[in-house]
Amino acid sequence: MSARDRFFRSLMMAGLFAGVFWVDAALAQGAGCAFAPVAGTSRQILRCQEGLTIIVEGGSRFTLVDRDRNGKVDAVRLRRKALLLDAPAGSIPGGFAVVTPQAIAAARGTKWAVDVARGKTSVFVLRGRVAVNRPASSAGVVLAPGDGVDVEAGTGPLTVKRWPAKRVSALLARFGQ
């Protein structure tokens, strides 16, 4: 790994970027991923080994994570804005997780969106199932297609809701879907 890559990796891991965080293309490739800009938008598509695809909303602040240090991305720390994730069944042994300040959303073989804004994390499932819990709690909920949950700081129970079409459409439009 070059000195430049080590430098950017240390910044990424320490979470020292201010403002908009863009994952360095060389680091993404080192983790088995490649970025592609979406023409005419501020969105990017991150395609990783094993078929994982992440559509990144413009202005998102996130960090790619290799929890088991096998050279493949298996989690994302999301701090701002939203990601639309598609992790085909069996693509990531042990599943894929999105960690936010308010929640952990973990899935296998699914398509889901995670949005962080104004002290709240919202998770919505399009396909498959996603387990959601607060970082400091093992109690959580499991979302099915069409289900969503809004997680705010605190210890109260999480409430699964069927999201109205208007809310789903507004979220997916942010990803060009």
Regions found by a protein language model. Give the residues of each.
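Bacterial N-terminal signal peptides
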Residues: L11-W22
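Sec/Tat signal peptide C-region and signal peptidase I cleavage site
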Residues: W22-A28
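N-terminal secretory signal peptides that target proteins for export/translocation
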Residues: M1-F8
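Flexible, surface-exposed loop/linker segments and immediately adjacent secondary-structure boundaries
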Residues: Q29-Q177
